[in-house]
Regions:
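N-terminal amphipathic/basic leader segments beginning at the initiator methionine
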Residues: 1-23
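Structural motif
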Residues: 6-7, 56-60, 80-82, 106-107, ...
Length: 142
């Protein structure tokens, strides 16, 4: 008998924890308004506000690629760029989604040791050019 090896490349490879499944089962009874105007979304949003101790907006996404891409898109315009390491997840595993959802914001890749950016590497990219034809650095991923 052979068993399938566990995969750790994505949180989409396995089921959810029993506590989350139980909460979803509890929410799956009765009726509630759709599109975020419901008690469940309000409770979850309030939990984030409590956790981060700030009055923040909460946007739910269906997976990590969507979350990463939409977060970067909310920070960048098409003429901006995102500085990341050569091993950054947004560079190696998002298949162009951050650029697509940000209307073309460019990923500017810095060489790194073990995927860690240095202040010098960030500075080198951020100050390389300042002309209109270069995407202005706006975000650094860590």
């Amino acid at each position: 008998m052979t068993s399938e090896p566990q995969q750790f490349a994505s949180d989409n490879y396995s089921g959810i924890c029993p506590e989350a499944w139980a909460a979803m089962e509890e929410a799956n009874h009765g009726h509630a308004p759709a599109y975020g105007d419901d008690l469940w979304t309000a409770r979850a949003s309030d939990a984030f506000r409590t956790l981060f101790e700030t009055d923040c907006e909460v946007f739910f996404a269906f997976n990590g690629t969507a979350a990463n891409s939409l977060a970067l898109a909310s920070l960048c315009q098409s003429y901006h760029s995102v500085i990341c390491s050569d091993a950054a997840h947004v560079e190696t595993d998002e298949c162009g989604a951050p650029e697509f959802f940000s209307n073309g914001s460019k990923l500017l890749v810095a060489p790194s040791a073990g995927g860690k950016l240095t202040p010098e590497a960030i500075r080198a990219i951020a100050t390389a050019r300042s002309d209109i034809h270069f995407p202005n650095p706006r975000v650094v991923t860590v």
